[in-house]
Amino acid sequence: MPPKRRHHGAGRVQNKRGKVDTVKEEIKPKDEPVETEIDGGSAVDEDVTDDLEHKTSKEDQKEDQKEEDGPIDAQNGTSETKVAGESVKTVEDKIESVTTNEEVVESPVNDYNASSTTTKAEEKQLEEEANEKTDTSPIVENEVVDEEAGTTKFDFDGQEYSYKDRPSVIEEKEGKIEFRVVNNDNSKENMMVLTGLKNIFQKQLPKMPKEYIARLVYDRSHLSMAVVRKPLTVVGGITYRPFDKREFAEIVFCAISSTEQVRGYGAHLMNHLKDYVRATSPIKYFLTYADNYAIGYFKKQGFTKEITLDKNVWMGYIKDYEGGTLMQCSMLPRIRYLDAAKILLLQEAAIRRKIRSISQSHIVRPGLKQFLDLDNIKPIDPMTIPGLKEAGWTPEMDELAQRPKRGPHYAAMQNLLTELQNHAAAWPFLQPVNKEEVPDYYEFIKEPMDLSSMEMKLNGNRYEKMENFIYDARLIFNNCRAYNGENTSYFKYANRLEKFFNSKVKEIPEYSHLVD
């Protein structure tokens, strides 16, 4: 085995979208034979015919019993995966030929209706809940849907509320796209959809081994939800593995084609998946490993780094990805996620109604007469201003309000830090160096620094001047170059990130002299 390189920063190389790059191969139970892989390197994927079928054998039947057999046995692993996107030594050197005399597994997805509109009963229930402990008048009046603009408006207590649908929602309503749940059931159309998903995952996750992606997408213990543009063009999807008895599912791959992004497909796809899973299974939680580029997406979809699910439930059952961040989503049982925009507006409307019942903040009073003559403005007692006393205002509040919450350079520092964190060369510097991985690092580097520590200091108002902020940024670059040799990738990453940082500082005239 080659010696480990010294490095600055925890983790391994990650890809830019979706999942992390480096895989620890899933290990099988003792009584389970090694499963065969499907070749993911073939380029002739669009001409899928009836002879493209996945294996079904006694090995598959044992694979399906994994959940009942117990956690993964770490002593029986027979495959090896190299780190950071290097070549993968798979279990078998030659892919098995696909058999055709197999028993067809019935798909569990046929009964799913991916409609994005609520029933009248659901709407009525939502209205009753939002109207609880208030008057019994209808919560929504004069609802108007503008299909051309993709907006919906309604009146509530005389106030107009509106929300705009994502382009993906509009396309679904117009019948241009659909969301299909598919698995490897030997049907020609489902195999074509799965192959389209495989191609997207392999393209969007370039550091992930192609044969590994193919094996999991075609694996019958996994399901996939695909975004399909009619007639049959796959533009993205999610592959996941359900553990019904343990009430959670593992999201294995999630990606949208690079040509179809920024249209809301990712968020709409996740909402469809949540509603489908809750409607067809006892699953209440999602778990997934996300790289640094995917964490933001998953946070927006309700995922968190705080894992509340008991380790005994999932440990040993999900695939472990080196360098990834484990995230969890707890699904709400009484929410239909496809209607989240309307539900949030209804909640806002109900809260505003409650506020109006106990406050006068909605009352608009006339302006002060003292300002009619701008040439002769006289001081006034604030307590004589109509409504101010009723709102609970005191002079002490004014003193607190006038204190600056942030330093004068905070906004510029925050923008610079965000730019640094999002740069492609920043991944080794996002977190402190792991002492267990690099034992002698803190003996050699006496003043360590990383981007997450800078973020904590910035949020704690510990940077009084821009010079202090730049000093810490320089610490990151100098520490890396001091510890790593010139020929290492980390040394080069530090140079790239420093050059980018200097260019960004120079774009701000009042600070440009600090990097000359």
UniProtKB/Swiss-Prot annotation:
PANTHER family the record matches: GH11602P, HISTONE ACETYLTRANSFERASE
Identification of the protein by name: Histone acetyltransferase GCN5
Positions of region (Disordered): 1-136
Composition bias, Acidic residues: 34-50
Catalytic activity: L-lysyl-[protein] + acetyl-CoA = N(6)-acetyl-L-lysyl-[protein] + CoA + H(+); (2E)-butenoyl-CoA + L-lysyl-[protein] = N(6)-(2E)-butenoyl-L-lysyl-[protein] + CoA + H(+)
Gene Ontology, cellular component aspect: histone acetyltransferase complex; nucleus
Residues that hold acetyl-CoA according to the record: C254, A255, I256, Q261, V262, R263, G264, Y265, G266, A267, Y293, A294, I295, G296
Bias (Low complexity) ranges: 97-110
Family matches, as Pfam families: Acetyltransf_1, Bromodomain
CDD domains, A to Z: Bromo_gcn5_like, NAT_SF
EC number: 2.3.1.48, 2.3.1.-
EC class: transferase
Protein localization: Nucleus
Biological role stated in the UniProt entry: Histone acetyltransferase that acetylates histone H2B to form H2BK11ac and H2BK16ac, histone H3 to form H3K14ac, with a lower preference histone H4 to form H4K8ac and H4K16ac, and contributes to H2A.Z acetylation. Acetylation of histones gives a specific tag for epigenetic transcription activation. In addition to histone acetyltransferase, can use different acyl-CoA substrates, such as (2E)-butenoyl-CoA (crotonyl-CoA) and is able to mediate histone crotonylation.
Bias kind Basic and acidic residues: ranges: 18-33, 51-69
Every Bromo domain range: 404-508
InterPro entries: Acyl_CoA_acyltransferase, Bromodomain, Bromodomain-like_sf, Bromodomain_CS, GCN5, GNAT_dom
Active site annotation, chain numbering: E250 (proton donor/acceptor)
Primary location class: nucleus
Gene: GCN5
Taxonomic superkingdom: Eukaryota
Record-annotated site: Important for catalytic activity: E250
Family: Belongs to the acetyltransferase family. GCN5 subfamily.
Domain N-acetyltransferase: start-end pairs: 177-332
